[in-house]
Amino acid sequence: MLEGCILAGSRQIESTTNNSVPGAPNRISFAKLREPLEVPGLLDVQTESFEWLIGAEDWFQRAADRGDVDPKGGLQEVLEELSPIEDFSGSMSLSFSDPRFDEVKAPVDECKDKDMTYAAPLFVTAEFINNNTGEIKSQTVFMGDFPMMTEKGTFIINGTERVVVSQLVRSPGVYFDESIDKSTEKTLHSVKVIPGRGAWLEFDVDKRDTVGVRIDRKRRQPVTVLLKALGWTNEQIVERFGFSEIMMSTLEKDNTAGTDEALLDIYRKLRPGEPPTKESAQTLLENLFFKEKRYDLARVGRYKVNKKLGLNVGQPITSSTLTEEDVVATIEYLVRLHQGDQTMTAPGGSEVPVEVDDIDHFGNRRLRTVGELIQNQIRVGLSRMERVVRERMTTQDVEAITPQTLINIRPVVAAIKEFFGTSQLSQFMDQNNPLSGLTHKRRLSALGPGGLSRERAGLEVRDVHSSHYGRMCPIETPEGPNIGLIGSLSVYARVNPFGFIETPYRKVTDGVVTDQIDYLTADEEDRHVVAQANSPLDGDGHFEEERVLVRRKGGEVEFVSAAEVDYMDVSPRQMVSVATAMIPFLEHDDANRALMGANMQRQAVPLVRSEAPLVGTGMELRAAIDAGDVVVTEKAGVVEEVSADYITVMADDGTRHTYRMRKFARSNHGTCANQRPIVDAGQRVESGQVLADGPCTENGEMALGKNLLVAIMPWEGHNYEDAIILSNRLVEEDVLTSIHIEEHEIDARDTKLGAEEITRDIPNVSDEVLADLDERGIIRIGAEVRDGDILVGKVTPKGETELTPEERLLRAIFGEKAREVRDTSLKVPHGESGKVIGIRVFSREDDDELPAGVNELVRVYVAQKRKISDGDKLAGRHGNKGVIGKILPVEDMPFLPDGTPVDIILNTHGVPRRMNIGQILETHLGWVAKAGWNIDVAAGTPEWAAKLPEQMLSAPADSIVATPVFDGAQEGELQGLLGSTLPNRDGETMVNADGKATLFDGRSGEPFPYPVTVGYMYILKLHHLVDDKIHARSTGPYSMITQQPLGGKAQFGGQRFGEMECWAMQAYGAAYTLQELLTIKSDDTVGRVKVYEAIVKGENIPEPGIPESFKVLLKELQSLCLNVEVLSSDGAAIEMRDGDDEDLERAAANLGINLSRNESASVEDLA
């Protein structure tokens, strides 16, 4: 949040990217522009805000370097606000200071393992002063365990990794608005003074041209009443506002005479029904706006009010309440706005522009980052504690009081716990892949407490605004009800101390672009003229063209002379977020499709073997490193030892560092997080170099998918409507195979009938089923399991039942009590299978922390290898998504002239109307990168290659290239490179200069009639896997009321034969089929059992009974006081019996059917 500005050296344009990170792969870059600023730390929005909250040393260091920062930590600030707490008589006080932390209780991995919270004990110094005797008692007080942020910007709460999302809210301040009156068509003006905490103050000019005021959303009254209540006389009002007719007419209509009457009038409006007195009215008004305990504009509100009204400009902010001058200046501004004045002279003599505010402008919306959100929660907890302290001060003996006896920390601890556990802004971290986690931490949400609700939010607040430029990405936002309410921070953006988002610009002085970087808020940017990053410059930094394309306030674009330009963008990718900046040729994609592309990259699952894209954007390395899933060297040195589990580095200063790998760990979303070394023993490594790849990374670069040979053509209609045809090679060679890990948990508790027991001795289970269980009853690691298999054996005591005479005889003879237990073992859920890769056992005997009543807890991890299959969803990076419709044998796939079969066939119809042409350009450049190129310069450098550096005139096969957004490969360069690709080993060029090739049909060997676009596209396998969605049911749980099967895979439900399906049956006249479907196959409970019995006994199927839903319908009609009866054909009333049929009970018992099985808790209960 408070990061200082970094200046990079003025290096020449590099033909390779990733140069700032040692040991990084060499990606050939098509960028034409030099970027004077490195991409800042992508997690700074989280980490710096939390450092401010706890008052970390690093934060103080940064605060000292900048003048606009109040050098006080967030905890210190909130303790100073609270102190001193005085009793009602003012004879004693308690104050707090010096918050500090002890060491964290357990490391991150242990907290995840044992369901603990990653936290450190918080201590403060509490000082009790007896004002009567002057006695001071000081103590260090424990204030509870405070959740700490990990290095990755996350929190571990009860063993799960969570992220606190930054919240976009309307800033406290003063806002002027304009509206048209529907009846008179007059332009009306109003103003709201919005505090951080406290009552709203609203002024408005109505259609009768009087100025009114609303205090705390109560009834409107003339504004002069408020001025008189503040001590103003009629003469003073005339002297200050004599220039305004509407103020004079308001004064004439005001019936109050003097301050006392005005105060009483306000009191009557605010407290109707209570007897008004001058003192109580005076106290009420002061408490509402002028007492810090009740009213808080916040530092940012004070700053905004001063800026808008031109008060105390340039002076340090001290007070955070309203002043009389604020109220008067606000009224004058409103009156002048209504008069149509352009400027107003502020009390300090400065000229202030008079204009209406745009509430959606980023100058009026600020960010509550994680530190401020937690600080607000602590403030709530401390204010609850304050009440307890005051009560204890009055009840306890003064001599015996110490700070410890007064303080109850429970409200503070509860407030923090409540925030992390239940707040809308504390979210379960998206760990699908490293990019999804990184984007989650950089997310900006307008929802949450104090924000908008998705039902109330209109189109204006959701829309892209010109002030978003360089601050919030205009592309990346969810589809659906949250569109525009949730955004993503732009690549270079940072947050200033007031919570406004700033973006960097290069300073332009007298038409010369310098390397000085200034961070501007949206308000400041409106005052300047800004040129775009790709404006051509000469070697000295002068603009090459006399007229430069710039943007002014409100996003207006025009050409101006170079001397008028104030600033220039630092980078073409300045306006987009990290995920959007990873889409090559973004500039050729329609924004709607780019939105889908950015979102779908976050849904890519980590594959068994990651592969970095042939065509990247240069953002892949920074994204992967900052996401924190790769292992990075802390100090330069030499690799001493490498194994699959750890890497040891001997640093140059003689210290030894061991880096542990995460091996096949389960992420929050069930994907596999595995790290593997990419360095060798004896290798020299520099500080910041990547030692080991994580999920979805290759050589330290983000690698979300695979480079596949794609042909864009229709194929027998099998790829109609975005369906995709795949080669069987991708299945056989595990190209798109991913590993998914599920966690299954069971606990043994104390019950009323005795303790549950985890055991191998399970009643009525064959030895075959128990074969893979160890002596404790827990499955062995490495066992292959499928649905229904026992993972952990558990028995639960059953209540004593009435014994049969035979059992009583056996007990009398043998004297032993039959074990009354039932099998409640943990079984593999329906539709799942895999290999057991890990087991964790927690036991009270081993002193593990377990919930009350739990004696033992067992977790089993089952890994499943999922090959790509029909029904899985694939996508490119341009919003081009589809479901696999057919997997063809390799020999049936279309092939190139040299016999190379393509991997994937996409339909041509997926491109034109979607306007995502970037996928075609990526396909062409992918082929160029895979084949390599050599530009013929014998007759001089071709015109299209004039801007390419010398190193880029040739490249070997399997090169990796970068085409940064808005500064990438040009169309002419792409065409030229396609004509310069290297031939294959037979000396033939497979793809023509237009990017098309002659393809042959794999089945007939005949060439297709037209050339086909062929190249390499980066394809992602998304988390929407068919294995998670496919589902079938024979019998299962029923709804308690209607007795119909439940719906959905999670409930093990069935397919609903709905209204339209019934119509279809009626149309065909299939009466008996329809009757069967509506009764015995659905909710005729008696009929169901009788049919089952008939099938078992081989008898004819009996007549259906009455469906349960018909009985429910009758009851509902009767509940509406309608007397509904069912009559037979002869007019006799038919009695509806409620399933107490003895025959039914008997038949069910004989067949072993449990008729009480309703809304089963789990699939295992169905057995």
UniProtKB/Swiss-Prot annotation:
SUPFAM superfamilies xref list:
beta and beta-prime subunits of DNA dependent RNA-polymerase (SSF64484)
Q: Which UniProt keywords apply?
A: DNA-directed RNA polymerase, Nucleotidyltransferase, Transcription, Transferase
Q: Identify the enzyme class.
A: transferase
Instruction: Quote a single Gene Ontology cellular component term.
Output: DNA-directed RNA polymerase complex
Under catalytic activity, the entry for this protein gives:
RNA(n) + a ribonucleoside 5'-triphosphate = RNA(n+1) + diphosphate
Q: Which CDD domains match?
A: RNA_pol_B_RPB2
What highest taxon heads this organism's lineage? Bacteria
What processes in GO biological process is this protein linked to? DNA-templated transcription
Question: EC number(s) of the enzyme?
Answer: 2.7.7.6
The terms under GO molecular function for this entry are: DNA binding; DNA-directed RNA polymerase activity; ribonucleoside binding
Any Pfam family hit: RNA_pol_Rpb2_1
Belongs to which family? Belongs to the RNA polymerase beta chain family.
Question: What job does this protein perform?
Answer: DNA-dependent RNA polymerase catalyzes the transcription of DNA into RNA using the four ribonucleoside triphosphates as substrates.
Listed under subunit, the entry gives: The RNAP catalytic core consists of 2 alpha, 1 beta, 1 beta' and 1 omega subunit. When a sigma factor is associated with the core the holoenzyme is formed, which can initiate transcription.
Q: What is the protein name given in its UniProt record? A: DNA-directed RNA polymerase subunit beta
Encoding gene per record: rpoB
